[in-house]
């Protein structure tokens, strides 16, 4: 807590009762901004006010004094609070929402207030605060030595999972995969900067990660003796992380977490490992600029539902090594392609809302009326999906059909209970339909019939009193009244009681009108209370079916993704990959799924073969010739196959890979103090230390960040290690043409190159993969395309000619440049004999006399 509040707490009597109440509440929430409800505003005080004014761009004012100094204050209107909360959550700031729970009209002193919820980046469930296209992960991390336990919770859907991994590299990879909104970790745990510096990082006390405490709290939640039924036997640190995460979730939500119905234990051995560099380089769902444009996800995502889009993103980031699941997904895609069934399914899915998050809000008792309307409309679609799935004669789709259960009772109940277009919130009523509840209809009838009563009373009183200016009215301040003009006011009957004097009229009340007023106003209040009670009963009734509804929502999301795969297979001309028992990758006319969609010209497809006899391809060719595209398309085709999708090729046969590694592109890490070359070597080290014979490795331009000798030596050694020791399936792109000599020594290494041709001093890229090494790099032609000045190109051409003809003496200097370019010998070029060597080659030592030998020494000395 800030120092000001701490000082103030010592002398609470110096403050007003209201501020004393605030300070006590703030003391319980030192790490959150406290939104303190005062009438129509949420107010913030002291350092909270200063911080909010800066982050939210609201006015910083003052209220009263503390120790003689004005108390800083800022506020936001309660009706617009969601917008401000959304901004704070995106900035990684947590907020405690303190509401008035007492009645100001009947309370002496400060109105009773209580923190009703704590909004944190990882625990939000409100629709306005969430990105519908992304999971919102709350992650807890615990550790013992080099082992990390990770627990993940998506509060919106109730998805809860745990797993254990080894080493910091694996931890960074998982954080990159999950991209959590909030991270909980022990205060004293040392974590990599890439984890600890994330927005939303929260240090927590060590005791919150106690394994035994975590186990007890989770068993209590799931009402089980142990967690073996969830597959948790053998887990240790992950249970400590899960216990902390669960306690934190309960603390922030202030209600039961009934939508957390299961705990999933993820097994890293069942998935393809993708490190952080690979996810970045392959641009799976975020491109190198940080947006979704031109990513694999953007090309594949034609899902009809928000929850389907989120599941697609998870699948893309978690390719599988489970053949049963992959074959199951493939069979569903094939069935949905039959007779264009996917088109009919997609039309129905478009009417289904974000059920996962709607059900999460229902469980947390924070669902709004329109959530229930969307649920009703979604459940009404289920019967239309059933025949489409059951007629497919596909086991996978039949299973989904059984899980997408029909809920006729709930549909009928919701349809009867809700008006067609309910208001956003229940606060003002108007949500429950007429005819649903007799008591509510009666109370509403009193208010509705008030107009008729007033007209009737006005007519009656005019006739009885003979006062033609008499009229009956109502306003919120004074309630119901009888108004008579000044000129006739003195003739008012004795039973008329004066209520208000106006400039031109007097207003009265009568015992009869007062009785009606009490009844009408009471009826309105009672009707609103009754409506809120009925709404809460609806929520409870839905919670009774929560688990079945959640299962159906998960099945709908899976159907949506499989249907999207079918639609994409049809639209993009994708084919079903064939999985084989033996290791290897064979692709016929493969295409890059993203680049193909961006190009205006036809994409040039290429073949690829990697097997036991050919485990590595050394790829040479000009820059812009397509080396990186060819490498990335191979990785994306393999990844798509192991997601269960069809792939962009004419045919694809492969064995399962366990990991995909990429070392492509150049970037530094200035924040971490690492140069471009250091980043390159760190990524290379990760590959060499972790790749296996079942891994796919892409390495591009290893060694270019240092001198020619160092770089070439490193590249050479990497090729040998990958080919001879690791035996990984490798695509190795390089500009070191000396590397192309290695296939002569390493039988499983082959040369290929990207074809190009030269026409009138210009380069034409053919983008075709050909056997053998490239004949030249076309570097000067690419430089010309890039706009390098002509004078520089002419000088470079002169230098190149002298180097290629074996005359590395300095070329004539350019007028504007007096320094001579330094030349570096080709490490593996055939050495040219010197004059001394040539002279010695003609000498027969045994034929020389001592004098001739001495003369030869003098002769050779002159040649040096």
Swiss-Prot record:
Position of the signal peptide: none
Superkingdom, taxonomy of origin: Bacteria
Gene Ontology MF terms in the entry: ATP binding; ATP-dependent DNA damage sensor activity; damaged DNA binding; mismatched DNA binding
Xref: SMART domains: MUTSac, MUTSd
Region of interest (Disordered), ranges: 804-833
List of residues binding ATP: 621-628
InterPro entries found in the cross-reference section: DNA_mismatch_repair_MutS, DNA_mismatch_repair_MutS-lik_N, DNA_mismatch_repair_MutS/MSH, DNA_mismatch_repair_MutS_C, DNA_mismatch_repair_MutS_clamp, DNA_mismatch_repair_MutS_core, DNA_mismatch_repair_MutS_N, DNA_mismatch_repair_MutS_sf
This protein's UniProt keywords: ATP-binding, DNA damage, DNA repair, DNA-binding, Nucleotide-binding
NCBIfam families named in the record: mutS1, PRK05399.1
Protein name, entry field: DNA mismatch repair protein MutS
Biological source species: Teredinibacter turnerae (strain ATCC 39867 / T7901)
């Amino acid at each position: 807590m800030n120092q000001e509040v701490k000082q103030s707490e010592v002398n609470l009597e110096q403050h007003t009762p209201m501020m004393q109440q605030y300070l006590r509440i703030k003391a319980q929430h030192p790490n959150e901004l406290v939104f303190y409800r005062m009438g129509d505003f949420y107010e913030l005080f002291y350092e909270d006010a200063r911080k909010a004014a800066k982050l939210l761009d609201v006015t910083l004012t003052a209220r009263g004094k503390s120790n003689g100094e004005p108390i800083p204050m800022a506020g936001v209107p309660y009706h617009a609070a969601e917008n401000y909360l959304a901004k704070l959550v995106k900035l990684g700031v947590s907020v405690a929402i303190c509401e008035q729970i007492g009645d100001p009209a009947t309370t002496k002193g400060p109105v009773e207030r209580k923190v009703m919820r704590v909004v944190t980046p990882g625990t939000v469930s409100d629709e306005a605060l969430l990105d519908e296209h992304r999971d919102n992960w709350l992650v807890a991390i615990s550790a013992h030595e080099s082992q990390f336990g990770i627990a993940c919770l998506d509060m919106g859907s109730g998805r809860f999972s745990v797993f254990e991994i080894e080493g910091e590299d694996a931890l960074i990879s998982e954080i990159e995969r999950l991209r959590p909104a909030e991270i909980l970790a022990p205060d004293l745990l040392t974590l990599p900067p890439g984890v600890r510096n994330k927005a939303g990082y929260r240090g927590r006390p060590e005791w919150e990660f106690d394994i035994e405490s975590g186990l007890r709290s989770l068993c209590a939640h799931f009402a089980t003796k142990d967690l073996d039924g969830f597959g948790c036997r053998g887990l240790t640190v992950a249970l400590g992380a899960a216990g902390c995460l669960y306690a934190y979730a309960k603390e922030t939500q202030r209600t039961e977490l009934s939508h957390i119905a299961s705990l999933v234990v993820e097994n890293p051995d069942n998935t393809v490992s993708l490190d952080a560099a690979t996810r970045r380089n392959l641009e799976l769902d975020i491109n190198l600029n940080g947006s979704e444009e031109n990513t694999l996800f953007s090309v594949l995502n034609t899902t009809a539902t928000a929850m389907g889009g989120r599941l697609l993103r998870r699948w893309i980031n978690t390719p599988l090594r489970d053949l049963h699941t992959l074959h199951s997904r493939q069979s569903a895609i094939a069935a949905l392609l039959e007779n264009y069934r996917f088109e009919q399914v997609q039309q129905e899915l478009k009417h289904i809302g974000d059920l996962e998050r709607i059900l999460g809000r229902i469980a947390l008792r924070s669902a709004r009326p329109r959530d229930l309307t969307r649920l009703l409309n979604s459940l009404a679609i289920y019967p239309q999906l059933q025949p489409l799935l059951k007629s497919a004669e596909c086991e996978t789709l039949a299973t989904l059909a059984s899980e997408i259960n029909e809920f006729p009772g709930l549909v009928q109940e919701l349809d009867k209970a809700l008006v067609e277009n309910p208001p956003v919130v229940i606060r003002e009523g108007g949500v429950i339909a007429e005819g649903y509840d007799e008591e509510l209809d009666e109370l509403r009838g009193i208010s509705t019939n008030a107009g008729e009563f007033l007209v009737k009373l006005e007519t009656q009183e005019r006739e009885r009193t003979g006062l033609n200016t008499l009229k009956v009215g109502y306003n919120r301040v004074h309630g119901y009244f009888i108004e008579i003009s000044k000129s006739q006011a003195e003739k008012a009957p004795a039973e008329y009681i004066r209520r208000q004097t106006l400039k031109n009229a007097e207003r009265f009340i009568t015992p009869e009108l007062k009785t009606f007023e009490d009844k009408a106003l009471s009826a309105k209040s009672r009707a609103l209370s009754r409506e809120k009670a009925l709404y809460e009963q609806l929520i409870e009734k839905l919670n009774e079916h929560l688990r079945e509804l959640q299962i159906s929502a998960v099945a709908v999301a899976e159907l949506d993704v499989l249907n999207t795969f079918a639609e994409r297979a049809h639209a993009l001309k994708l084919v079903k990959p064939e999985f084989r028992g033996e290791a290897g990758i064979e692709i016929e006319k493969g295409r890059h799924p993203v680049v193909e969609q961006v190009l205006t010209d036809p994409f040039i497809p290429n073949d690829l073969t990697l097997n036991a006899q050919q485990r590595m391809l050394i790829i040479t060719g000009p820059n812009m010739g397509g080396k990186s595209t060819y490498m990335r398309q191979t990785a994306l085709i393999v990844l798509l196959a192991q997601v269960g999708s069809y792939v962009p090729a004419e045919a694809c046969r492969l064995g399962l890979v366990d990991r995909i590694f990429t070392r492509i592109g150049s970037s530094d890490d200035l924040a971490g103090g690492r140069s471009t070359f250091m980043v390159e070597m760190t990524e290379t080290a990760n590959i060499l230390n972790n790749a296996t014979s079942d891994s796919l490795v892409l390495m591009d331009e290893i060694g270019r960040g240092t001198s020619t000798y160092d770089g070439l030596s490193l590249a050479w050694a990497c090729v040998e290690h990958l080919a001879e020791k690791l035996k990984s399936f490798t695509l190795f792109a390089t500009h070191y043409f000396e590397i192309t000599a290695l296939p002569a020594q390493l039988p499983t290494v082959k040369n290929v190159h990207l074809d190009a041709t030269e026409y009138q001093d210009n380069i034409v890229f053919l983008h075709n993969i050909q056997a053998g090494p490239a004949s030249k790099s076309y570097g000067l032609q690419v430089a010309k395309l890039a706009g390098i000045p002509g004078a520089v190109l002419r000088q470079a051409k002169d230098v190149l000619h002298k180097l290629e003809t074996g005359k590395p003496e300095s070329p004539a200097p350019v007028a504007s440049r007096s320094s001579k370019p330094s030349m570096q010998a080709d490490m593996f070029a055939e050495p040219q004999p010197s004059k001394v060597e040539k002279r010695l080659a003609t000498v027969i030592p045994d034929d020389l006399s001592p004098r001739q030998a001495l003369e030869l020494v003098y002769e050779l000395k002159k040649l040096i």
